[in-house]
Amino acid sequence: MPVISMKQLLEAGVHFGHQTRRWNPKMKKYIFTERNGIYIIDLQKTVKKVDEAFNFMREVASDNGTILFVGTKKQAQESVRDEAIRSGQYFVNHRWLGGTLTNFETIQKRIQHLKKIERMEADGTFEVLPKKEVVLLKKEQEKLERFLGGIKDMKGLPDALFIVDPRKERIAVAEARKLHIPIIGIVDTNCDPDEIDYVIPANDDAIRAVKLLTAKMADAIIEVNQGEELTEAEVAPVEEKATEETTEA
């Protein structure tokens, strides 16, 4: 049984592509028809591709891998942040800083600087500093948090990227490809699907469509993690029983 239904996709407007004059011919195989100058995406193919992406997400999560959610366009910012947090992963939902992946050491230095400012605020250092200096530090903190807050606890490079609109996030795509990090992407009719390992052909401009698909990818991670918790809960009583029996013996 597919992880997402045609009805859900239709209700969220996933099938609406871009205007016919704004398209990438490589997306032809994912297009069902054209209506009033707009391409209509073949949702049967979307259902299948969501399944493939969902299963890959589960694989990554099963190996304790990390996934970086990326979506800096207005329609994606909230969903990308909320679903990454909900699934215990990382996100970039404002401007992608060049070198986020390919120059990870430098990015880490900026993150350490952000954490240093946070410690200064927490331990009372701000109270003994001149007001002007505190204002500047707070501005810097706000800026760093905006761009790096979603990855400040990410210890190393992610094992996969989930991207909303690879065309807009082309720098993130290029960096991931250079480092051979697999990409799952919500790909509209104006994108190049060849750059994406797991293509989800869909409307990347409708908030409801983006939210539905991003949440579904997060669900894959949560399912795996909840499964692990359940297994541990089931194993604990067995171990306790075995210990009791050994003690009695």
Swiss-Prot record:
Annotated organism of origin: Listeria monocytogenes serovar 1/2a (strain ATCC BAA-679 / EGD-e)
Name assigned to this protein: Small ribosomal subunit protein uS2
Keyword Ribonucleoprotein annotated: yes
Family matches, as InterPro entries: Ribosomal_uS2, Ribosomal_uS2_bac/mit/plastid, Ribosomal_uS2_CS, Ribosomal_uS2_flav_dom_sf
Signal peptide feature range: none
Family recorded in the similarity comment: Belongs to the universal ribosomal protein uS2 family.
Residue ranges crossing the lipid bilayer per the database entry: none
One Gene Ontology term of the molecular function aspect: structural constituent of ribosome
Keyword Kinase among record annotations: no
Gene Ontology process terms (BP): translation
Keyword terms of this UniProt record: Ribonucleoprotein, Ribosomal protein
One Pfam family, short name: Ribosomal_S2
Coiled coil residues, start to end: none
GO cellular component: cytosolic small ribosomal subunit
NCBIfam families on file: rpsB_bact (TIGR01011)
